[in-house]
């Protein structure tokens, strides 16, 4: 071996030794990006534990986006945007989680009975009817009338306490699945129909009927004559909380 070759070999040995010392612990494992923080990142938890009134977004993406429209006493810990529900069903208010969540499986229902609802109404009539924010056909309804305990327990499978002193009245928690939630218990002050109804945006709404009629309905308490009307026409000035009723037909009979 020539002196030049020996010198070159010696230099290479020193270079390799220096690289090994600079590396430190000698770990030469090549780590892929999938072995790092991305793999250890925990999956986001669903903003709800269970849901009866699930809604799927119209966005054509996969996994799809879901939102739970259940009204609850307290949102799940994973919910980021918990908003107050209008006209909540619980004492002290109700809340809805408005988060959208991307998942293949939105999770189980909270109320197993919703899978086999009875088509029979638990109530004969209802003034404070509420349509649930679900999208089946026919729709789902709940009656929030305050009843005497004996009335509620006789008609409903489940009752809850109404707001106010305890013990007091009860509210039926049963859900009815059908197209017709039934008649009102308290008659509308203007009768069964109205052409000129004015209602606020509450749920249920408070309404007035400005129809000019030959005579007010028997249930009207504040019946006033329209000025300068000949023959005389009348308007019921009462307010009513609930649906104002269908349009009167034919209009000429008013």
Curated annotation (Swiss-Prot):
Tissue/organ expression: Expressed in roots, leaves and flowers.
Residues passing through the membrane, by range: none
Database matches in Pfam families: Bowman-Birk_leg
UniProt superkingdom: Eukaryota
Gene Ontology molecular functions: serine-type endopeptidase inhibitor activity
InterPro entries: Bowman-Birk_prot_inh (IPR035995), Prot_inh_BBI (IPR000877)
Signal peptide: 1-22
Induction of the gene: By wounding.
Propeptide: 23-118, 252-254
Sequence repeat segments: 46-120, 121-187, 188-251
Keywords: Disulfide bond, Protease inhibitor, Repeat, Serine protease inhibitor, Signal
GO cellular component, one term: extracellular region
Disulfide bridges in this chain: 51-248, 125-185, 126-143, 152-159, 156-172, 193-248, 194-209, 199-207, 216-223, 220-236
Marked site positions, Reactive bond for trypsin: 135-136, 201-202
Similarity field: Belongs to the Bowman-Birk serine protease inhibitor family.
Protein name (record): Bowman-Birk type bran trypsin inhibitor
Organism lineage: Eukaryota, Viridiplantae, Streptophyta, Embryophyta, Tracheophyta
Annotated gene: RBBI3.3
